[in-house]
Amino acid sequence: FTGLRIPNNIALSKLNLKAATEDLNKAKEDISISVTSAYLQILFNEELAKVAHNQVELSREQLELKEAYFKNGKASEAEVYEARARVAQDEMSAVQADNNYQLALLELSQLLELPTPDGFGVVSPRVEDDFTLLSLPEDIYAQAVLNKPSIKAAQFRLEGAAKNIRIAQSSWYPQLNFSAGIGTNYYNISGVENASFSSQWHQNFNKYLQFSLSIPLFNRFDTRNKVKNARIQRTALSWKLEESKKALFKEIQQAYYNAVAAESKYKSSNTATDASEASFRLMSEKYANGKANATEYNEARTNWMKTVSDMLQAKYDYLFRTKILDFYKGVPLTLE
């Protein structure tokens, strides 16, 4: 009997294993979020590249019209050169957009620790504008506090601290030890007649049974200090658990209001994109018919491109924010 030190040590080891497992799960969660963010960045850059290439096609069409008008005397040579410069500029923007897309693919491939990004690509999911009602932070927290690995790891360590106190207290109890054994021996002396092996086996056979009792009286307050330190550690871990819970609630609050802001921005950017696209189409017709100059056309085009870029950024930001809220509720990160 050792004051239940052995079973408490076993229980402590199991709790430490559980805490380490939750630490591993926390690391997996962090990787999942990083991969999701990198994946959404790829989708964002891919759509920007498509917009850039569409703009190249529009500029080429405008160039063809200007060249035709120039042959008919309806456009000046300067307007043709302006149209050519615009095509070259848009082609350069498209190349830059393609490069950004490839860099985003490279980042994700590195996160996945692929040997090379060559041949690596992603499948674009079908993303619909589903503005569902967001769960309140309090409701999300009630689910997250039961499932998040960081909280569970802190709880297991707090339980382990209680076992540590029991282990330290075990030195206050008497220690009862038991031992037993059996044995025999054989010897051979040169020049003397020796008994046979079988005879010695039986004659020299012995066995013993031993009990020892150790009663602690005074050990220079070593046990008291160990118990005191174990209790201090338990208090510190209890505070750490509460701090982890508070930090989790703050994270959820921030994620919630970020999602609300992203939803509002996405809705307004959709409206702005529709308006700027209609304005650009109208300006393109005016420019093609000579009713608008290059400056007006470029201004309308730049405004449209900016609103499209803002809309795409708002779209994937909103998608990421809502997925993070679901993730806190224990929903796996998917884009199906």
Which positions does each model-derived feature cover?
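Metallo-beta-lactamase
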Residues: 97, 149, 314
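Structural signature of outer-membrane beta-barrel domains
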Residues: 1-2, 183-187, 218, 328
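Amphipathic alpha-helical coiled-coil segments
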Residues: 27, 31-50, 68, 104, ...
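Small/polar, glycine/serine/threonine/aspartate-rich low-complexity segments that form flexible
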Residues: 8-9, 14, 124-133, 166, ...
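Amphipathic, heptad-repeat alpha-helical/coiled-coil signature enriched at exported N-termini
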Residues: 2-38, 46-59, 77, 81-84, ...
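Periplasmic alpha-helical coiled-coil/stalk elements that build and connect Gram-negative outer-membrane
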Residues: 30-143, 258, 262, 304
